[in-house]
Amino acid sequence: DDDTVDRTELAKELSHKYTEILIDEYQDTNKAQDMLFRAISDNEENLFIVGDVKQSIYGFRLAMPEIFLQKRKHLPDFNGKNYPAKINLDENFRSRKEVTEYINYVFSRVMSEDSCGINYDDSESLKAGADYEKSAFPCAELHIVDKSKIDCEYLPEASHIADIINKLVAEKMPVKTKSGYRPVMYKDICILMRGLNDADDYFD
């Protein structure tokens, strides 16, 4: 459990080759990777890591998001001079305000110190960094599926999603393109899944 790094001569030699070391998606690193990155850095002073615990998806290959959490917890805020330190990038420029508000609402209720190692409070919340044209349609919806009320041969969730998609297409919900607006088409819609175990039901 000791996370100290005893640098080999090779690690020291390699560290001289890198002015800066930048690692993205650090929430998905494991202990071995973390120690390797630290070993080839200059006492971590030139090691720049970026991560978001909410996006950790590689548990199947032993990702340890708690490594990133511990660094965030113990590093001081960057004062413009001293390293290592942390910088909180909480502004989101790619999403509507309604989306960031929805994300904050959901995660503030499901993420806690006990369950995820982090309390999702105001200091963790996303801030909308850009203004977008107001939409007449909801940017996000949360559907609770009552499986007992859906009688079908497929997964209730798959059937429910199919109904939503068919309704959007039937009602010709407008989507914005470079040349203006047009009715939504099936090819515009993407279904994100946690895994492929039940993919056949969704395909059907």
Give the predicted meaning of each segment:
Residues 9, 13-23, 27-204:
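Conserved motor-region signature of P-loop NTPase helicases/translocases
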Residues 1-7:
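Conserved helicase NTPase catalytic core signature
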